[in-house]
Structures are given as C-alpha cells and as structure tokens.
C-alpha cells in the first residue's frame, strides 16, 4: 500500500497544505522546528487516530484554531481508499470512503504504518506503559478485533476502578460480576498479545541475527501479571489472581492485576537487553521495526508504510545499508532529515520536499 495524497488543515504548524507523494521514497528536508516531524505525525495520526508524540489531542490543533482536518488517499491492491479525520474540542470523527466510522476498530487497519524514531530506544529502556502502547499500536493495525477487545477491557477496568474509589461499602456480588467481565475481555487481550509476541519474535530473531553478523540471538518474552503458562486455564488463573489481589485492590482503590499491568522483555543471547550498549539497543530496535514490516506483510498481504524520523544519521553504515535494502523494495518510505549528506546511498526514484515554516515544496525528483 502507499499514500498517494495528504491534505492537512490546521494541523500543528500547517495552516493548509496539500501534497502528492512518491510511491517509493519521500524525503522531508529542512532545519529543525520547521514541521518535518509534524508531517510524519500527520501520516501516523491519519493511520492510527493517535499521535506518537503527545497524549493530548488538542496539542495537534493549530494554536489559533479550534479544529483540524486530515485526509488522505491510500492505494492498495484492492483499489483506492479515502481516509479522513476531523478533530475538534469535542472529539474526533473518522471516515473511510467518506462514511463515518462508529468504532476505532472499524477505522484502524486501512492504512498500516511502521514508525522508527529516536525515542523508540525507550522501547528497551523505558517504562512498561511504553511497551504496552507499542503492542497496542502494532497489533491493532493487523487485528481489528484486538482493538475491540482492548476497548471493552479498558471500559470494564474503568468501571471497576471507579467503583473501588467511590463505593462507601463494597457489594462483593457486584464486584464479582465486574471481575467476570474483566476476565472475559482480559483473557482475549492476553491471548492476542501472546500470539503477536511469538510471531514478532520469530521475524525479529532472523532480522537481528543478520544485523549482528550472526553473533547475537534475539528473544522476546511476554510478561503478563497473570500466569499464562497454561492457555487452557488462563481464565481460571486470572480469576484466582483477582481474588488474591482483592484486599490489595480495596485498600489502594485500583486494580492490581490484568493486561493493563503487562510488560515485555527483550533478551540478547539470553541476557536482558536493557543492560546492553547503545549500539545494541539501536540494532535491536531496528530489528524489531524490520520484523514488524514482514509480520504485517505476512498477515495483510500489503506492505506497510515506513516512517523514519531523523534516524538515518543515528545509524552506522551496516545498519543504514540494512535499512536501505528494505527501502529499495516495494515499500513506501518517508524520511525526515536536516541534511542529505549522510543519505548518498538512497534509491534514485525519490521525491524531496523542502519543509519551511509549515509549508512543503517539491524540489527534486
């Protein structure tokens, strides 16, 4: 798949911009703070209805406006698909083929993206919430039912936590009803995540072995807060975990176990990767991103769109060449950079856009 056209209206520092893209390689060139990353963020937001840079949607709206509008035309094997997002102070409206979508799971997945940015190193060193968000964003694109199950789980979780905080006297029967619903959707979420991690590890192990000159083996471990060794008895394990945590939950007035407490760990040759070098972290994250591309292709039969936010200068020659091999294949890629000096090996079929003060101008093909 590839993004043929993008229209931005009052998004970040863009007042109104319309731009047609190259089906292969697109380079956003410009000084810092001109809007290069904002352009990538717009593409990411159009795909996922979420920003990778802020949790607050209103930060995306131009400072002197009250709403924003994004639209794009995606080309796929099955034909072209118009996508639209309108964001106001009241919320967002999403459209596919000009039809309003009632649920997030009905929208996400029509345009798949893989983002590689400097902050992705936090995937190894950062908090568990960063890794959970990574799973949610990637898995949600290839398995819409996951987003539906996750949304339902979070809804029940919010209900349970609100009840724990507000009730003067806890009705154990009502709490058990909430627990049963939490277990139902929670088990679905954990099973989705377990299957995803296994597939990601399979693709990632191969990529990392190649990238490390056949000396490092990558493994990924899913670490739920519930014992998941026996998938057949996962529901029972979750119920027992909630029962054991109930006194703690009543005291702290929140839910101590469940998918919202999950984590994943990365290992290189059996050693915790978080203790590795900066170079190992870069290689590991690159391996994961390349694995994501193959995983998405294997499930959707479409290549995702690759977004590279100022990462080429961070990679050594070996890692750059490995990434460029992927770019040279049939995958649309967007790169942000302040200079073309370190991009000599780029494919010939590319478009260069100069970004300045929230405006994009084509200056090379």
Curated annotation (Swiss-Prot):
GO BP annotation list: DNA replication; DNA synthesis involved in DNA repair; double-strand break repair; SOS response
Question: What's one Pfam family the UniProt record gives for this protein?
Answer: SMC_N
Where, per UniProt, does this protein localize? Cytoplasm
Q: Which UniProt keywords apply?
A: ATP-binding, Cytoplasm, DNA damage, DNA repair, DNA replication, DNA-binding, Nucleotide-binding, SOS response
- Which residues are noted in the entry as ATP-binding? 30-37
What NCBIfam families does the record point to? recf (TIGR00611)
Family recorded in the similarity comment: Belongs to the RecF family.
The organism sits in which domain of life? Answer: Bacteria
Kindly state one GO CC term assigned in the UniProt record: cytoplasm
Q: Which Gene3D superfamilies does the annotation name?
A: P-loop containing nucleotide triphosphate hydrolases (3.40.50.300), RecF/RecN/SMC, N-terminal domain (1.20.1050.90)
What's this chain's function? The RecF protein is involved in DNA metabolism; it is required for DNA replication and normal SOS inducibility. RecF binds preferentially to single-stranded, linear DNA. It also seems to bind ATP.
- Which species expresses this protein natively? Streptococcus pneumoniae (strain CGSP14)
The leader peptide range reads none
> What is this protein's record name?
DNA replication and repair protein RecF
């Amino acid at each position: 798949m590839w993004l043929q056209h993008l229209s931005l209206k009052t998004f970040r520092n863009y007042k109104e911009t319309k731009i047609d893209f190259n089906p292969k390689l697109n380079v956003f060139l410009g000084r810092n703070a001109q809007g290069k990353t904002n352009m990538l963020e717009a593409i990411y937001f159009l795909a996922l209805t979420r920003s990778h840079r802020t949790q607050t949607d209103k930060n995306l709206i131009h400072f002197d406006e009250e709403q924003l509008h994004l639209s794009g035309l995606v080309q796929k094997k099955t034909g072209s698909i118009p996508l639209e997002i309108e964001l106001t102070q009241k919320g967002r409206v999403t459209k596919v083929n000009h039809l309003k979508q009632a649920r997030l799971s009905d929208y996400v997945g029509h345009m798949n993206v893989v983002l590689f940015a400097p902050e992705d190193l936090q995937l190894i060193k950062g908090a568990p919430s960063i890794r959970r968000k990574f799973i949610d964003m990637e898995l949600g694109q290839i398995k819409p039912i996951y987003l539906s199950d996750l949304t339902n789980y979070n809804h029940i979780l919010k209900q349970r936590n609100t009840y724990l905080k507000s009730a003067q006297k806890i009705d154990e029967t009502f709490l058990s009803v909430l627990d049963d619903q939490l277990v139902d959707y929670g088990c679905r979420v954990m099973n989705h995540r377990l299957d995803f991690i296994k597939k990601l590890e399979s693709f990632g192990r191969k990529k990392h072995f190649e990238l490390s000159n056949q000396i490092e083996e990558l493994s990924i471990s899913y670490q739920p807060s519930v014992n998941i060794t026996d998938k057949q008895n996962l529901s029972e394990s979750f119920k027992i975990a909630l029962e054991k945590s109930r006194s703690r939950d009543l005291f702290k007035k929140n839910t101590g176990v469940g998918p919202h407490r999950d984590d994943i760990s990365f290992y290189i040759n059996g050693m915790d990767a978080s203790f590795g070098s900066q170079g190992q972290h870069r290689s590991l994250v690159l391996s994961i991103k390349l694995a994501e591309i193959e995983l998405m292709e294997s499930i959707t039969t479409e290549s995702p769109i690759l977004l590279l936010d100022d990462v080429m200068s961070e990679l050594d020659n070996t890692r750059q060449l490995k990434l460029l091999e992927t770019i040279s294949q049939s995958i649309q890629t967007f790169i942000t950079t302040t200079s073309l000096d370190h991009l000599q090996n780029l494919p010939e079929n590319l478009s260069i856009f100069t970004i300045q003060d929230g405006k994009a101008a084509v200056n090379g093909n």
